[in-house]
């Protein structure tokens, strides 16, 4: 029963919006039932990424104006955590951020990578240094070590190596990538809010921010 209660996280992303981080915070409120352990938001302002991650509920961390002001930009992604893998600590709170030669990116991930330990051992053998104990960082290292040139191709290559049930929102300077496992086990929906595109774990989050549902 405990495993069932702890199998869900919530992810939310928006691109091309004037107040992206405020929209994400509101969306995460609607997804709070999916994870009460921690919450985080990363934004992109056209020049650099900004991140705020904290233990506890969305309301306790993102209802303060100064926090949202510290997350400027037209794109943002967020995460509420209820861990299935990895210890309960700030280093495992998402979104996780990484910087490559091809640019930086932030990842918000829901799900479990069933072959994560096998991949982690192989990556460590090849020289990767892990900073967290979450499955998400395994994906980041697979992206970093991919021989493909573009970030999109690196992610495609990385996800071909993972097994399990997952949904991902990846924010890059060029745009936002959203994907699900091949069987679509973990939920992810797409919506629009004016000119903005939104991805979320559940349609209730689209409803709360006033977005129109587009597809699953």
Give the location of each predicted region.
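Conserved short alpha-helical segments that host acidic/polar catalytic motifs at enzyme active sites
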Residues: 1-216
């Amino acid at each position: 029963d405990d495993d069932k209660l702890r199998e869900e996280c919530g992810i939310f992303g928006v691109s091309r919006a004037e107040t992206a981080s405020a929209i994400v915070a509101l969306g995460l409120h609607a997804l709070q039932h999916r994870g009460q352990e921690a919450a985080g938001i990363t934004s992109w302002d056209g020049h650099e990424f900004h991140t705020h991650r904290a233990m506890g509920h969305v309301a306790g961390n993102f209802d303060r104006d100064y926090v949202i002001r510290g997350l400027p930009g037209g794109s943002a992604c967020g995460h509420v955590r209820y861990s299935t893998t990895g210890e309960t600590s700030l280093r495992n709170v998402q979104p996780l951020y990484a910087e490559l030669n091809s640019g930086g990116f932030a990842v918000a991930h829901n799900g479990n990578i069933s072959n994560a330990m096998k991949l982690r051992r192989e990556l460590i053998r090849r020289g990767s240094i892990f900073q967290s104990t979450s499955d998400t960082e395994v994906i980041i290292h697979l992206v970093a070590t991919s021989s493909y040139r573009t970030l999109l191709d690196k992610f495609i290559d990385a996800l071909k190596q993972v097994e399990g049930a997952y949904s991902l929102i990846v924010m890059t300077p060029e745009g936002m990538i959203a994907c699900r496992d091949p069987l679509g086990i973990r939920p992810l929906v797409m919506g629009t809010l004016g000119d903005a595109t939104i991805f979320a774990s559940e349609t209730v989050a689209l409803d709360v921010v006033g977005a129109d549902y587009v597809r699953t």
